């Protein structure tokens, strides 16, 4: 079960509701694959201040598109009007996904071992996390508007970058799980890499991540520069260009990367697990505009 957080406010303010449903599906099904489960079906809950049939249609169409890409069935949902509690154009969207995994294939955080390498899968945008900070930086600190260019000379606006749809990783990760030995899968959501990698390893391991192994998308760098935010805070709020991380035996890393690439999900080795105490260490110098 998950939602899309305050990204929905950007969608409401712009009236661009067509992709927010896809974001919802991504947040739910990509959590499922962290347990090794393949998504089976999906339900949604939509609360509105006042029902707008066109808006509801756009939201549900986005959910249906996301489910089709994720390979799960949209089997139902619930819609509720909350007049007097929510503003007429406000909405809240929640999703619920169910998947299946054989008991002996369940990923529970105990399989990862020292020497495993970390394979990061690229995320070109914010996905659905960090929007409270992103909104504060762009609107309150920098005084920008949604129609402004995302950066000087950009062909996209702030709204375009903030509403860019989340990548759905589930089909590619399910394929990799079926073909290779994978010890852990982490969904990089709120908390970033430092907050999510500890969920998939025990406290006898450390995750050592090399920042120089991938390029941070420019919009993250633009947000950071708007408010002079520290690297540590950026990495604890945003995905910084990596939406999922897999822990795999070193001998299988290249094959896993190739399988993910064959499903149009570019990935690369970004670090390793070492003997430790449950910490995440961010080493190296970041690629991307600082």
Locate the predicted segments by residue.
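Short helix/loop capping segments that flank catalytic or ligand/cofactor-binding pockets
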Residues: 8, 128-130, 196-197
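Short loop/turn motifs at secondary-structure junctions
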Residues: 36-38, 133, 181, 266
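Glycine-rich phosphate/pyrophosphate-binding loop regions near the starts of catalytic domains
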Residues: 1-124
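Gly-rich Lys/Arg/Thr-decorated short loops/hinges at beta-loop-alpha junctions or inter-strand turns
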Residues: 3-12, 150-157, 201
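Glycine-/charge-enriched secondary-structure boundary and capping motifs
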Residues: 55-73, 86-91, 145, 152-163, ...
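Short, acidic (Asp/Glu-rich) active-site segment that either coordinates a divalent metal cofactor
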Residues: 92, 105-158
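A generic structural signal for residues located within well-ordered alpha-helices
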Residues: 20, 129, 165-168
